[in-house]
Amino acid sequence: MLEFYNIVKSAFYRVFAGIIALLLTMSNGINAGFNGDIYPYESNSKVFGLETIERGQGVTTDGEAWYFSGKTSLVKIAFDNQTVLAYNYEAIPEEFKDNYGSAHIGGISYCDGYIYAPIEDSKVWEYPIVAVYDAETLEFTGRYKILPNDIMTRGMSWLACDKENGLIYSSHSKEATELYCFDLETFEYVKTVELSEMVGKPQGGEVYNGLIYIGSNDMTRAVYTINPVTGEVTKCFDRIKYEWKLIDNFGGEGQDVTVYPMEDGTLIHALDIGALFMDSNLRHYKWD
């Protein structure tokens, strides 16, 4: 009986490995078709399988490690792309789930030892929340605020912290024509800045040298900058050639960006999910 069990188990593993290999081949083929190196990246911190789930939404950095958000999780990864320094796989507090229907973490931002996370009741859009986590442990600090849903009318897909000006930025999650500004300490609404042009499907942002760098999931998953004072929008580059829209997000999905000057000369670090949602890519770009 044991010999038969081992034969069956071995056959199952071989079939399973073959299926995974086939799916990865398909995923890489589709990725190659869409990721046409419109603007070349220098390197790619890539993961497959289950790790994709925990690196599927947002990214930020403190200059010493990467912080990723999944749909309901936070994880801190060393720059070697392998060593897990901290994790919180149930990052959405139970009280948020019970009281507000919270189900989704978006594009995150690091500031002064804390991770600021946007949390929403996905597809309901009634309770957009800013929640604060300890960057060392990724544990929830207890600090949070429900933002006004007459301003944040379609949930909260991203936020970016601006330490210098004491602000948090966000926008409409599908068609951003305005930049919403909140106080970094109290989370109270401060002002709205009109944008010079619409940014489609913003997924995350980071403030660097006075500009907000935005990662989008528009037709080319473009990266933009926004001047938070004037509202001027500038496209930096396209990440793919064109997204075929017969099937939504066919070919993968553009996600968050973080900005930090690395020793290899890269500055913009842009997250995307590959075709078939089997791989997560953090692509590192040089930018002047």
Regions flagged by a language model, labelled:
Residues 73-78, 124-132, 176-181, 220-227, ...:
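Structural motif
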Residues 197-229:
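Loop/turn-rich, solvent-exposed surfaces of beta-rich toroidal or solenoidal domains
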Residues 63-64, 112-113, 164-166, 209-211, ...:
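Short coil/turn segments that connect the beta-strands within blades of beta-propeller domains
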Residues 71, 120-122, 171-175, 217-219, ...:
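Short loop/turn segments immediately following the C-termini of beta-strands
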Residues 35-36, 42-48, 85-101, 140-154, ...:
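Surface-exposed loop and turn segments in beta-propeller and other repeat-based domains
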Residues 53-60, 98-107, 150-161, 198-207, ...:
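Repeated scaffold domains used in trafficking and secretory/extracellular systems
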Residues 66-92:
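Beta-propeller domains
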Residues 47-72, 104:
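Beta-strand-rich domains and repeat architectures in extracellular enzymes and scaffolds
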